[in-house]
From Swiss-Prot:
Active site: 177 (proton acceptor)
Subunit structure of this chain's protein: Homodimer.
Keywords: NAD, Oxidoreductase, Tricarboxylic acid cycle
Taxonomic source organism: Shewanella sp. (strain MR-4)
Top-level EC class as recorded in UniProt: oxidoreductase
EC assignment: 1.1.1.37
Protein name: Malate dehydrogenase
Length: 311
């Protein structure tokens, strides 16, 4: 099993690489790429951790050496949010970065499962899809926008609010990965009831949690460590699916034939081909149905931005 992390010298990339070095199955290869010259050194640093995961780092303009033979590619390359920015402000820089990296993926490892972490995810996944289509290698079951951070935040905040063991909290988060497009389905959380006020405030906190971190770091960064953990959880689920483990389900932003938009975050069953099955997200409350319907213009606009960027 070979996993490549593109953007591995950044805050998310380094955290993700550390977690993968400690969690990937024995005999795996972990390949780190970043434009930054420090990247081979990050790999050397991580190589001193005693796990049976072989690690190599590559720097420079061309990610190709890192991508050869990759089964899973996780892309976190790009600039991070600063106070006053929202995820869409990142578009101007990150769109080109994702396009260039995916062009290399299309040539070097077109069958790899690709997880896009780089924001704005609503748009960068659409960019990736268009690039892969142009190259004639697009497989909708192998491309994912990583929205796991919205899920782990939801689990954490619910557990805190209700005094639960967070390991027992399961919640689907649907829609997209920015602001109003993030929709936690709180009505489905088992064994818990929320007042209308709790639903409204919890939904808002989950939607704005990224901004909470950006402001708390006071210009010193964005949510890198929690995102690293979320990306590792999702990446490990991809790996476990590829290895044939049963019942691996995660929410992800995918081209899953949704009635709502071309790309939509919902639960997917993972397996040897990436997505084995897009799962229904179930019954929703009136509040959730309204929130879902009112986000769709925003979501579709984000997607169109990505499609138009490549065309």
């Amino acid at each position: 099993m070979k996993v490549a992390v593109l953007g591995a010298a950044g805050g998310i990339g380094q955290a993700l690489a550390l977690l993968l070095k400690t969690q990937l199955p024995a005999g795996s290869q972990l390949s780190l790429y970043d434009i930054a010259p420090v990247t081979p050194g990050v790999a050397v640093d991580l190589s001193h951790i005693p796990t049976a995961v072989e690690i190599k780092g590559f720097a420079g303009e061309d990610p190709t050496p890192a991508l050869v033979g990759a089964d899973v590619v996780l892309i976190s390359a790009g600039v991070a949010r600063k106070p006053g920015m929202d995820r869409s402000d990142l578009f101007n820089i990150n769109a080109g970065i994702v396009r260039n990296l995916i062009e290399k993926v299309a040539v070097t490892c077109p069958k790899a499962l690709v997880g896009i972490i780089t924001n704005p995810v609503n748009t960068t996944v659409a960019i990736a899809a268009e690039v892969l289509k142009k190259a004639g290698v697009y497989d909708k079951n192998r491309l994912f926008g990583v929205t796991t951070l919205d899920v782990i935040r939801s689990e954490t905040f619910i557990a805190e609010l209700k005094g639960l063991n967070v390991a027992d909290v399961k919640v689907n988060v649907i829609g997209g990965h920015s602001g109003v497009t993030i929709l936690p389905l709180l009505s489905q959380v088992e064994g818990v009831t929320f007042s209308d006020e709790e639903v409204a405030s919890l939904t808002k906190r989950i939607q704005n949690a990224g901004t909470e971190v950006v402001e708390a770091k006071a210009g010193g960064g964005s949510a890198t460590l929690s995102m690293g953990q979320a990306a590792c959880r999702f990446g490990m689920s991809l790996v476990r699916g590829l290895q044939g483990e049963a019942n691996i389900v995660e929410c992800a932003y995918v081209d899953g034939g949704s009635e709502h938009a071309e790309f939509f975050a919902q639960p997917v069953l993972l397996g040897k081909n990436g997505i084995e099955k897009v799962l229904p997200y179930g019954e929703v409350s009136a509040f959730e149905a309204n929130a879902r319907d009112s986000m769709l213009d925003t979501l579709k606009g984000d997607i169109k931005l990505g499609v138009d960027f490549v065309k």
